[in-house]
Swiss-Prot record:
GO terms for biological process: arginine catabolic process to ornithine; arginine deiminase pathway. Belongs to the arginine deiminase family. This is Arginine deiminase. It comes from Bacillus cereus (strain ATCC 14579 / DSM 31 / CCUG 7414 / JCM 2152 / NBRC 15305 / NCIMB 9373 / NCTC 2599 / NRRL B-3711). It is found in: Cytoplasm. One of its GO terms (molecular function) is arginine deiminase activity. Disulfide bonds: none annotated. Pathway: Amino-acid degradation; L-arginine degradation via ADI pathway; carbamoyl phosphate from L-arginine: step 1/2. It is an enzyme of class 3 (hydrolase). Its main location: cytoplasm. The gene is arcA. It catalyses: L-arginine + H2O = L-citrulline + NH4(+).
């Protein structure tokens, strides 16, 4: 294997992808804590698992190697000291010592096998799991209506966000919301210690210790030389600028970063919830991200006179900016919901724009977004529909649920 990570486009034939099968963390959602854990509803676990399995099998049927985050994480933690270090960091970042002694919870977690340990950390630790005899501090014995010592991580099935493959390296991301911060720790340990990746010295273009947030749903690889990044509710302009400088100074293939400002709201959480690439010259778009005349704030970042300087060019037309950076004379923006004010809002809420391209002109979408799917087919796109009644409750689509590890070049 020359490069364990290789992604130079959004549409190159998908060869290897990272998923996370929804687990106990979904059943640990309750109405009182939905907002805190970034959910709007509670999926039904048996059905969301069936739907996710269908999604994974759909990818396998097209020749894609499917890896699972939970399996890789367990395989990475073979060393005893490494396990302890990982648990220490999870507990510290999860602020678990507020209601229980760090050592008490650490000993409980380390009593499990690697596979069970990862599932337990992802699923959360309820207070009633720790025996009363183990609680030796007054604050551990206090009645508290909050049910968890360690919060569940229900957003983990959206593997796109904690890390993003960029060329032969990746970003391991500082997540904006506290509920998701721990998620990228799994990828840090997988890249450093899993035998599939550890021996290759994979470049980390931006790591999770950088103080400003960036999330993978905002990172789109347009081609070998150009990436687009959303300036969104979850990704800051400062992180984009730092990533651009790192890329320009540490490698020579990516020459342009397109920063695309989108409205900062939950419905438009990441760039890929409102804009995705489906073919060489075709993109989906949610019309509501554009102004009355199609105006937007777009900035083309290029290398400046030195490593800490950028050349920044402002553009106001997404269509023209894409033509410029991709070297195209024409391209097509396909509106989510056909541009109908009701259908576009409804289907965007259920991730009608969040397509996963598995080859040029071939995409995986949710079956429920029939207006958008019909329009994609009318534009010559092969649309592979997957089940979505429960998966869509997390406000993420096929692109959100997948982290491409390897794609063929286009």
């Amino acid at each position: 294997m020359k490069h364990p990570i290789h992604v130079t486009s959004e549409i190159g034939e998908l060869q290897t992808v990272l998923l996370k099968r929804p687990g106990k963390e979904v059943e640990n959602l309750t109405p009182d804590y939905l907002q805190q854990l970034l959910f709007d509803d509670i999926p039904y676990l048996p059905i969301i698992q069936k739907e996710h399995d269908y999604f994974a099998q759909t990818l396998r049927n097209r020749g894609v190697e499917v890896l699972y985050l939970e399996k890789l994480a367990a395989e990475a933690l073979v060393d005893k000291k490494l396990r302890e270090e990982f648990v220490d960091r999870i507990l510290k970042e999860g602020q678990a010592d507020v209601n229980v002694a760090h050592q008490t919870l650490k000993e409980y977690l380390l009593s499990f096998s690697n596979e069970e340990l990862i599932q337990k950390i992802m699923g959360g630790v309820r207070k009633n799991e720790i025996e009363t005899s183990k609680k030796t501090h007054l604050y551990e014995l206090m009645e508290d209506h909050y049910p968890f010592y360690l919060d569940p991580m229900p957003n983990l099935y959206f593997t796109r966000d904690p890390a993003a493959s960029v060329g032969d390296g990746l970003t391991i991301n500082k997540m904006r919301e506290p509920a998701r911060r721990r998620e990228s720790l799994f990828m840090e340990y997988i890249i450093k210690y899993h035998p599939r990746f550890a021996k290759h010295n994979v470049p980390i273009w931006l790591d999770r210790d950088y103080k400003f947030p960036i999330e993978g749903g905002d990172e789109l690889i347009l081609n070998e030389e150009t990436i687009a990044i959303g300036v969104s509710a979850r990704t800051s302009a400062k992180a984009i600028e730092r990533l651009a400088k790192n890329l320009f100074s540490r490698q020579n293939k990516i020459k342009k970063v397109l920063a695309i400002e989108i409205p900062k709201c939950r419905a438009f959480m990441h760039l890929d919830t409102v804009f995705t690439m489906v073919d060489y010259d075709k993109f989906t778009i949610h019309p509501a991200i554009q102004g009355p005349k199609g105006n937007m704030n777009i900035y083309i970042l290029e290398k400046g006179s030195d490593e800490e300087t950028l050349k920044i060019t402002h553009r106001t037309s997404l269509m023209e900016a894409l033509k410029e950076v991709l070297g195209l004379s024409e391209l097509v923006l396909i509106p989510c919901g056909g541009g109908d004010v009701i259908a576009s809002a409804r289907e965007q809420w259920n991730d009608g724009s969040n397509t996963l391209a598995i080859a040029p002109g071939v995409v995986v979408t949710y079956d429920r977004n029939y207006v958008s799917n019909t329009l994609l087919r009318e534009h010559g796109i092969e649309v592979i529909e997957v089940l979505s009644s429960e998966l869509s409750r997390g406000r993420g689509g096929p692109r959100c649920m997948s982290m491409p590890i390897v794609r063929k070049d286009i």
